[in-house]
Amino acid sequence: MSRASGYEILQKGVDNMITGQIIQTSIDELKAITKVDLGVYDLNGSEVASTMERDDITTDLITGFAASPADSQVIGVHHLLKIRDEGELLYVLVARGMTDDVYM
């Protein structure tokens, strides 16, 4: 592995860590305002940030929704939304709850 590629890998890890911290801070603030539990997952179903226990949020739930043509979907108490940046799907947002507040 060349030095440049090692640096690039390290930089990507640092960027992902910073992005995860920013996302966590954002959803913590949103939860404080909305009182709704939120989770952000990457397209492989790995948790990026969350205000709730993962419990019944499976990898298959996240990856299946990410692969579907739907932009949002309600499955039980989970409200799933796709997060895009300039048209590229990056994350899946999960809001948990049965009240009207979840339909932010």
Where are these regions (language model features)?
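Alpha-helical/coil-rich non-catalytic "connector" segments in signaling and regulatory proteins
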Residues: 1-104
